[in-house]
Structures are given as C-alpha cells and as structure tokens.
Regions:
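Compact beta-sheet-dominated domain cores in extracellular/mature segments
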Residues: 2-10, 18-152
Length: 152
C-alpha cells in the first residue's frame, strides 16, 4: 500500500512540474533585463539568450509584428522582456528592439525579427528548431547581422 501511495504522489508531483514548465514557456520567457548574445554553433555564429539557448525567427512574422500565438507560442515561446533588451558581446545594440504582443507584453526583436525559443532546445548549442516548417512557415536562426541562416 505504501508503494502505491508513493507512486501516486511522485506521479502527481511530476505532472504538476510538467504543467508549470509548459505554462512558463507558453507565456514566453520573461525577464526584467533581457540579454541577447551570440554563440558559435554547427550553423555558424547565431543569436542566443544569456544562457546560450538558441533564438529563432518565424518567417510568417511581417512588419516586426508577431504572428505566433496560442499553440504556436506554446511550442515557440516568445522572448519577452520588461525593459529595454541588452546587447551582449557580438550583438549590435542598434538592431535590438521590442514589439508589443496582443497581450500587451513586449517581445524582443532583432533587425525587426521577433525572437522565439523552441521548446525542444533545452541546452546551450541545440538548434533543433532550425529549418522546421510549422504554423504556416519556416523557422530560422539569425546571424549577428540580423539575417536568417538558411542551413540545416
């Protein structure tokens, strides 16, 4: 009986932790000071966050505005900030900006491209979202020049 109760307690804790992680990603990764940096990857030098996690561009976005909401934002969480984004080493501060999302939050942009994470990238250096065709368009990493890198 003890083993069954322990199993149920562990299963419930694991399920709750999973919901919290998904909910955090679905709302975007919000930071007071949001830093964008660069890192070397198998695709070349790319944009990453302060922890080295890859940032992506969604080809569907037009005019610097995000078109990724709902299920899209659950898989591709936007990089959200509460203030002006900070340029890390190798990032052009003049290319950093923000765009207001439908919920009023500020999403970080680079060279006019709203920036997103991919939920499958959990460690620095992972680029599993590169060249993925989801939600009507392709997803690409960006170079420090703010250009899409079309290698996969």
């Amino acid at each position: 009986m003890y083993r069954i109760k322990l199993f149920v307690a562990l299963a419930a804790t694991t399920a709750l932790a999973s919901v919290v992680v998904v909910a955090a990603f679905a709302g975007g990764a919000e930071r007071v000071e949001t830093k964008v940096a660069v890192a070397k990857s198998r695709l070349g030098t790319i944009l990453v966050d302060s922890k080295g996690i890859t940032l992506y561009d969604f080809v569907q976005d037009k005019g610097g505005m995000s078109s990724c909401y709902g299920a899209c934002a659950a898989l591709w969480p936007p990089l959200i900030t509460k203030g002006k984004p900070v340029a890390g080493h190798g990032v052009r501060a003049s290319l950093l900006g923000t765009t207001k999302r439908k919920d009023g939050k500020l999403e970080v942009t680079y060279n006019g491209h709203p920036l997103y994470y991919f939920v499958s990238d959990r460690k620095p250096g992972q680029t599993t979202g590169q060249d993925v065709n989801q939600f009507g368009a392709l997803w690409w990493v960006l170079s420090p020049a703010g250009k899409e890198i079309h290698r996969g």
